[in-house]
Amino acid sequence: MLQSLARCPYPFVWQALAANPHTPPAALRELTTARDSVWNDNRLLRLLAEHPGADHAVLRAVLDAVATKLAEGERPYAAVLSLAGRLELEADELRKLGTFQGTSARLRHLLDLRLSARIR
């Protein structure tokens, strides 16, 4: 049932699925390509990055989507910082997010703080 809802055209449904801890990774993976508006897309990516059931494939897809948004000049900063807290992803992969033109000095600083806290 949750898998079929991921194909729904409504962003509030996508966000509800991404916030539901019982949503399976396959449905989460499908949500990584959902697009609506800048605000809704960035919120969805943050929710996916924070989801307790997100596996490596889901997190990798979120990472790729966030990188694309940064390259386009958008600011999915909350998703970047949420990804930085996920140990399933390599710190070097995440550190690259700070090199995009769309990142601010503050985001780079917070990203470095989160990644350095992971090492300890």
Question: What are these model-predicted stretches?
Answer:
Residues 1-120:
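Alpha-helical scaffold segments
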